[in-house]
Regions:
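Extracytoplasmic small-molecule ligand-binding "clamshell" domains
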Residues: 36-118
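Acidic, polar ligand-binding/catalytic clefts
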Residues: 91, 95-153
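A ligand-binding cleft/hinge motif common to bilobed small-molecule-binding domains
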Residues: 118-126, 197-234
Length: 288
């Protein structure tokens, strides 16, 4: 998001976050509100969020990581956020305006508590957001109808979703043949129609998408190191970004994620969405 996920990384223009639309989802013990159950004991009693009793999340559609559904977010990352909210007795509020490009700016400007949508841990992002401990690893891939690899992109028209960590490198390399999109529907629509030759995306996201919306002849080929795109050197680790000014929230996220890994919740969520559960053991935190 990968979406620094479809991937999903993502133009960091705060202006795109104007006018966020908020919708709510209850996420504590299945009750109408988290506060309605006095028996709910938060894992971190000193936790402070933008709105008391709520966990405000900036997100967008990036299946299988985030799937906007009704008034909430599901997908393996969305489900994990809801599990974290249960641990902290919080109601999840989802802000969806602005697409992928609005997520990180919304976290920076404190319009939301956390971002979601396959965001990878990178050195650059350490300067602007608190990066949680890794949720899981996420190989990146080249998606095309002609079997292109990461060595075959020069001279081709390539698409990527706003905010992807490799966007700047690929823009410099490919120039005006590199196109940035705000959402998966647009980018895969252009791939299907032949308006672009390939998409750079999360391998998990592309494979999941093709289960329900296949494109004839499309292949998903994991990237190989390419001197023009330093971000292709290693497999990325997905994280939840939060404000650098709320250290308590960042620490709580780290501890909750660790707990949910140790009790098997993360493994079950990955399996639920058809993802190899081995990616749920990403190793020590690292940055691309």
């Amino acid at each position: 998001m990968s979406r620094t996920p479809r991937t999903l990384l993502r133009a960091l223009s705060a202006g795109t976050a104007v006018g966020l639309l908020a919708i709510s989802l209850t996420a504590c013990g299945g009750n109408d509100t988290a506060s309605s159950t006095s028996a709910c004991k938060p894992a971190h009693s000193d936790l402070k969020t933008i709105t008391e009793g709520e966990l405000t999340v900036a997100s967008y559609d990036y299946a299988p990581a985030t799937i906007l559904k009704g008034e909430g977010v599901t997908g393996m990352e969305g489900d994990l956020i809801n599990e974290i909210a249960k641990l902290e007795c919080l109601k999840v509020t989802v802000s969806t305006s602005g697409g992928a490009g609005a997520v990180i700016p919304s976290v920076q400007s404190k319009r939301v508590d956390i971002g979601s949508g396959n965001w990878l841990r990178t050195k650059e992002r350490t300067k602007i957001v608190y990066m949680s401990t890794p949720l899981w690893s996420d190989p990146q891939a080249i998606v095309s109808k002609t079997g292109l690899t990461s060595d075959d992109l020069e001279g081709k028209v390539i698409g990527s979703v706003a905010g992807n960590l490799w966007n700047d490198s690929m823009q410099k390399w490919l120039g005006d043949k590199f196109k940035i999109y705000q959402d998966d529907e647009s980018i895969y629509g252009d791939l299907k129609a032949g308006r672009i030759d390939a998409v750079v995306a999360s391998s998990a996201s592309a494979n999941y998408r093709f289960k329900s919306a296949p494109i004839e002849g499309a292949t998903v080929v994991n990237v190989k190191p390419n001197a023009n795109v330093p971000q292709f050197v290693a497999v990325g680790q997905v994280m939840l970004p939060s404000s650098l000014d709320n250290a308590a929230l960042g620490k709580a996220l780290d501890e909750d994620i660790t707990k949910l890994r140790e009790d098997g919740t993360i493994k079950k969520l990955l399996e639920k969405y058809g993802i190899d559960p081995s990616v749920g053991e990403p190793g020590a935190p690292s940055e691309l």
